[in-house]
UniProtKB/Swiss-Prot annotation:
Record organism: Pleurotus ostreatus (Oyster mushroom)
Main function: Has hemolytic activity against bovine erythrocytes at nanomolar concentrations in vitro. Promotes active pleurotolysin B (PlyB)-dependent permeabilization of membranes rich in cholesterol and sphingomyelin. May play an important role in the initial phase of fungal fruiting.
Protein name: Ostreolysin A6
Cross-referenced InterPro entries: Aegerolysin-typ
Pfam families: Aegerolysin
Recorded superkingdom: Eukaryota
């Protein structure tokens, strides 16, 4: 039932410097393994993961089956070369029984460029969102 509410977030490091994921939390729904909504995974599997240059990291979340809930969550991208200074904060909300989804990117770190695409803000799944990260300069 609520498996129709899902999001896949692909972090793609298109730059030449590492970026790290921190503080991933699904406050509604669950995180799951690639391609298997029944295989729940812990946020700790992602905590502190480094996305190296030209690598991708995929985060999958969905509502719970047979439950009237969608998926909501947050995470941060941080700069491991700058004391884990926040690059951006990300928030998603793909609620069950609502006609509106939310994808918000907040914060500012002028050393980094962040571009994203693919989010569906209408009803149904939030979809597959690609987040490109690039640290400016060396």
């Amino acid at each position: 039932m609520a498996y129709a509410q899902w999001v896949i977030i692909i972090i793609h490091n298109v730059g030449s410097q590492d970026v790290k994921i921190k503080n991933l939390k699904a406050s509604w729904g669950k995180l799951h393994a690639d391609g298997d909504k029944d295989a729940e995974v812990s946020a700790s599997n992602y905590e502190g993961k480094i996305v190296k240059p030209d690598e991708k990291l995929q985060i999958n979340a969905c509502g719970r089956s047979d439950a009237a809930e969608g998926t909501t969550g947050t995470f941060d991208l941080v700069d491991p070369a700058d004391g884990d200074k926040q690059v951006r904060h990300f928030y998603w909300d793909c609620p069950w029984g609502s006609k509106t989804n939310t994808w918000t990117v907040s914060g500012s770190n002028t050393k980094w460029m962040i571009e994203y695409s693919g989010q569906n803000l209408d009803s149904g799944a939030l979809g597959t969102i690609t987040v490109d990260t690039l640290k400016k300069g060396n």
